[in-house]
Amino acid sequence: MTTSFPAHFARQYDSHLKHLKLKGLQPKTIDAYARAIRRLGGYFDYRIEALTEAQLTEYFSDLIGTHSWSAVKLDLYGLKFFTTHVLKKPWAMPDLIKPPKTQRLPDIVTVDEAQRLFLATRVLSYRVFYFTLYSLGLRLGEGLALTVADIDAERMRVQVRDAKGNRDRLVPLPQATLAVLRRFWLTHRHPELLFPNRSAGLKGAQRASSPLDRGGVQLTLRKVATA
């Protein structure tokens, strides 16, 4: 049991963690929902079992001033999970917050749009990454998580790990994509990561401990796609 919290909150928090794990959620989702309850607990002196709408309105108003809308939404989702699974109460405040609408990039691009994207991207890592996503039909997170071992050149397929629904899947590997990936790998020669982080430059890519930065990839994609 967690000992750094008051006893009543520690029991609730431990129950929250158990329910999160039993639901088979992704580790990053578990971390976010757990952090939400810790933050709420700290704000309300660890008494969060009977919060009113007025109290939560005040909490989220303060949170918006110091955190991103993404963090605000995750705290809301974490509280909703806690309310329904730990407190066993119905969630009665669906309209508590309303994030501003954002312009999202299309999930599917045409062949012409994809070609313009590849040609307009100046950074080699991003260009190869976008080409790989498009040719294999991967999501952003799936592409970032690719490793050298996931590429099966003999059977011409790619193993995508922890895909949607926490399931692994196999996708066909086009010959052109294999050729591009092989040439690209020669530029960094990382023993594991297919798209190593370039924060330390090309020479440091071989020793990178993480893949390309998700935020940097999204920002570059948005700039190119909306140019």
Regions found by a protein language model. Give the residues of each.
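Conserved catalytic core of the tyrosine transesterase superfamily
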Residues: 1-227
